[in-house]
Amino acid sequence: MEIAPGMLIAHMHGDWNAEMRALIASQMKAQVPTLNAAGPWGIINHMHDTLVYGPDIYAQTRADYANRPAGSRLQAVAFVIAPHVEGASLLRSRFESLLDGVIASRVFADSQSAKEWIKVQLQLLDASGPNPGN
């Protein structure tokens, strides 16, 4: 887990199951008060090894973002999925639509592009107000 100005960067390694997902979610949630206090922010979920997860992982991820607290200042979510990640060619599209209608989100092949997009989303927010979805 990394914190950068206006960003929480979570590095997802190994095979994912409900327990591992819950552990990472709790670690991320522990950072939320600090991030909210600093202003609007975004998350980058960097998938390093695989996208081959059970359907419950996808459903719970969507539910967590949809049910974030009303006071949350989270404004955008980026997923980093490099072409070499297991399942990327077949499952990337799942991430491209995972958060449609929930929060602004996008998928990138590299971390730098994801960081730049998050920064732009936060700048757009400054100019126009919150963006509740894609």
Task: Locate predicted features.
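Amphipathic, Lys/Arg-enriched alpha-helical "gate/interface" segment within cytosolic domains
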Residues: 1-134
